[in-house]
From Swiss-Prot:
Classification lineage: Eukaryota, Metazoa, Ecdysozoa, Arthropoda, Chelicerata
Transmembrane stretches, start-end: none
Protein name: U20-theraphotoxin-Cg1a 1
UniProt xrefs under Pfam families: Toxin_12
Tissue and organ distribution: Expressed by the venom gland.
Position of the signal peptide: 1-21
Subcellular location: Secreted
Free-text comment about domains: The presence of a 'disulfide through disulfide knot' structurally defines this protein as a knottin.
Family statement drawn from the similarity comment of this UniProt entry: Belongs to the neurotoxin 10 (Hwtx-1) family. 40 (Jztx-35) subfamily.
C-alpha cells in the first residue's frame, strides 16, 4: 500500500514537471507562471502602497485588500475581502 502511494506521488510529480516544462516552452517565457504571479503580488513599491505588515497612518496608505490596523505599532493587514 505504501509503495503504491509513493509510486503514484512520484508519477504525479514527474507529470507536473513535464507539463510545466512543456507550458514554459510553449509560451517562450523564462519564468514559470507562479513566479510571475508572485511578482505581481509583491510590486507594492511601484503602486505607491504599503504591502502586508508595512507601516501606515491611514487605510489609503495600504495596498488593495489591506487596511491600516490602528494597534501600536500600526501596520497594513488583510481587510477580509477577496479579489
Amino acid at each position: 500500500m505504501k509503495v503504491s502511494v509513493l509510486i503514484t506521488l512520484a508519477v504525479l510529480g514527474v507529470m507536473f514537471v513535464w507539463t510545466s516544462a512543456a507550458e514554459l516552452e510553449e509560451r517562450g517565457s523564462d519564468q514559470p507562471a507562479w513566479l510571475k504571479s508572485l511578482e505581481r503580488i509583491f510590486q507594492s513599491e511601484e503602486r505607491d502602497c504599503r504591502a502586508l505588515y508595512g507601516g501606515c497612518t491611514k487605510d489609503e496608505d495600504c495596498c488593495k485588500h489591506l487596511a491600516c490596523r490602528r494597534t501600536l505599532p500600526t501596520y497594513c493587514a488583510w481587510d477580509l475581502t477577496f479579489p
